[in-house]
Amino acid sequence: MAEPTMDSLLARINELAHKNKTDGLTDEETAERDHLRKQYLKLFRESFRSQVEMMQVYDKAGKEVTPEKVRQIQRDKGLRDD
């Protein structure tokens, strides 16, 4: 089975949220909602971390001021030559 996308997870989470407001959720649906939320947060964090690790920061003078921690991660992943 393919890994669900953030959009598909969010759509189902929203369906369950709407149902919870109108009719309430069964125990199975509550467990599904909790599982979907955890999956969504995991994917969100992975995506955000990847974006931060790929980022380079420059000041107004054009000098790179990327934090050393990020630079080291980039070096470890082979994304930097310096």
UniProtKB/Swiss-Prot annotation:
The keyword Ligase does not apply. Pfam families: DUF896. It is found in: Cytoplasm. GO terms for cellular component: cytoplasm. It comes from the Bacteria. InterPro entries: DUF896. Keywords: Cytoplasm. Belongs to the UPF0291 family. PANTHER family: UPF0291 PROTEIN CBO2609/CLC_2481 (PTHR37300), UPF0291 PROTEIN YNZC (PTHR37300:SF1). This is UPF0291 protein LVIS_1359. The lineage of its organism: Bacteria, Bacillati, Bacillota, Bacilli, Lactobacillales.
